[in-house]
Amino acid sequence: GGGGGDRRSDMRLDIPRVIAGEDTRTTLMVRHIPNKYTQRMLLSVIEQNHSGQFDLLYLPIDFKNRCNVGYAFVNMISFHHVPAFYREFHRRKWERFNSDKVCEINYGRIQGKRALIAHFSNSSLANEDESMQPVVFASDGSGTRERWHSPGGGRRGF
C-alpha cells in the first residue's frame, strides 16, 4: 500500500548498494542520447569497454523521422558489471555531433533480458528491418550475437 514513494528515486542507481549486492537489477536506461546516434554507433561506444558484459541493447527509433527517441536500454549480464558501466557513462558528454547532451543512467522499469524481449516483441518490431530491432547477445559473456525473434513467433511466412 501507501503512495509508493517517489517513482523516480526508485530508478536511481545507488552504487554502494549495488556493490554490496543489495540491489541486483541489471537493466539500465541510458538517457539523453543525441538523436543522430544509431544503434550501431551506440553499440560500438559501449563495446569499447563493456564487450561481453551485456546481453541486450535497444535504441528505439521514431519510425517517422528515423531518429532515435533519446534513450536506450542495456541489460547487463550481471549486476556486478553495473558500477563500471555507470561510472563510465553517467554524466558523460557524448563525443559525436558535438552535442551538449549529458548522459544519465537510471534503472529501466522492465528488468531482465527475457522480460525485455517479451515486452518489445509485443510491438511491431518483429516486422521492422534489423537496424530497428534490439541487439541480443548470448548471456554467457561470449559476445555471441543471437537472432532477435519475438517469442510469439511473429509472421512465419515462406
Q: Can you name each region flagged by the protein language model?
A:
Residues 72:
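Extended catalytic cores and adjacent scaffolds of nucleotide/polyanion-binding enzymes
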